[in-house]
UniProtKB/Swiss-Prot annotation:
Gene (UniProt): Napa
Function: Required for vesicular transport between the endoplasmic reticulum and the Golgi apparatus. Together with GNA12 promotes CDH5 localization to plasma membrane.
InterPro entries assigned: NSF_attach (IPR000744), TPR-like_helical_dom_sf (IPR011990)
Species annotation: Rattus norvegicus
Family named by the database record: Belongs to the SNAP family.
PANTHER family: ALPHA-SOLUBLE NSF ATTACHMENT PROTEIN, SOLUBLE NSF ATTACHMENT PROTEIN SNAP
Recorded topology in the membrane: Peripheral membrane protein
Domain of life: Eukaryota
Protein name in UniProt: Alpha-soluble NSF attachment protein
Phosphoserine: residues bearing it: S26, S29, S195
Subunit structure: Interacts with PRKCABP, and disrupts the interaction between GRIA2 and PRKCABP, leading to the internalization of GRIA2. Found in a complex with VAMP8. Component of a SNARE-like complex that contains at least ZW10, USE1L, RINT1, STX18 and NAPA/SNAP-alpha. Interacts with VTI1A. Interacts with STX12. Interacts with GNA12 (via N-terminus); the interaction promotes CDH5 localization to plasma membrane.
Length: 295
């Protein structure tokens, strides 16, 4: 694709849009429908933005979408303005993550003002993902996942809310905010128990909650396992519960080999992900004479 040609076309469209805006501000335009010129300018800015996208000039595309959004606001077209801010955010994602967040936040402001909380929640997730992958700021990612969960809950979209909360719990545990993680895992685990479709995953949430308890204190973990078995009898027969009991026993005996062996055995059937590996290593370090490795 001829990107330089697309770039030149986009620049020409920008100039045309700017002329329309200027003309709309003249005295005669004010008398004879300046707003239709603004509408035309909105359209031309959006065309320019798409042309910049084809030329892979993401910042220029983002800026052109922002110009269109501002004009839509001038015309009181809130929905169109929000759509343009989202388009701007998506373009900036490829060039300037912080600017992408700023644009998505502008869109969220408009959507919440209009009472469109489900769509606002979706864009909070997009912001959280930028903080996770591009800007690597876990605290801010957590805040946006929490906000998203709040909006979803308010709209009775509980399964979407729980997905966001599980992200929060995972990061909270990594940041050693164990009680926060435990509260979420227990809450999501309890609600999963009552659903025929989600029942099977309840054991995983109780397992994760028990590991967080273990990171705080062994007695805590022991009591938690008992509580989960009473609450959800199917947990007793799960491989996760059996592993917890073996780990508690190994910890009580301060037996590193037994601890490592139990983890290896579990891992041979259900591969440990990064999160579980981190938690299990933290617990292992509290056993005397540990050798730093799980396998």
């Amino acid at each position: 694709m001829d990107t330089s040609g697309k770039q030149a076309e986009a620049m020409a469209l920008l100039a045309e849009a700017e002329r329309k805006v200027k003309n709309s501000q003249s005295f005669f335009s004010g008398l004879f429908g300046g707003s239709s010129k603004i509408e035309e300018a909105c359209e031309i800015y959006a065309r320019a933005a798409n042309m910049f996208k084809m030329a892979k000039n993401w910042s220029a595309a983002g800026n052109a979408f922002c110009q269109a959004a501002q004009l839509h606001l001038q015309l009181q077209s809130k929905h169109d303005a929000a759509t343009c801010f989202v388009d701007a955010g998506n373009a900036f994602k490829k060039a300037d993550p912080q600017e992408a967040i700023n644009c998505l936040m502008r869109a969220i402001e408009i959507y919440t003002d209009m009472g469109r909380f489900t769509i606002a929640a979706k864009h909070h997730i997009s912001i959280a993902e930028i903080y996770e992958t591009e800007l690597v700021d876990v605290e801010k990612a957590i805040a946006h996942y929490e906000q998203s969960a709040d909006y979803y809950k308010g709209e009775e979209s509980n399964s979407s809310a729980n997905k966001c909360l599980l992200k929060v719990a995972g990061y909270a545990a990594q940041l050693e905010q164990y009680q926060k993680a435990i509260d979420i895992y227990e809450q999501v685990g309890t609600s999963a128990m009552d659903s025929p479709l989600l029942k099977y995953s309840a054991k995983d949430y109780f397992f994760k909650a028990a590991l967080c308890h273990f990171c705080i204190d062994m007695l805590n973990a022991k009591l938690a396992v008992q509580k989960y078995e009473e609450l959800f009898p199917a947990f007793s027969d799960s491989r996760e519960c059996k592993l917890m009991k073996k780990l508690l026993e190994a910890h009580e005996e301060q037996n590193v080999d037994s601890y490592t062996e139990s983890v290896k055995e579990y891992d041979s059937i259900s591969r440990l992900d990064q999160w579980l590996t981190t938690m299990l290593l933290r617990i292992k370090k509290t056993i005397q004479g540990d050798e730093e490795d799980l396998r």
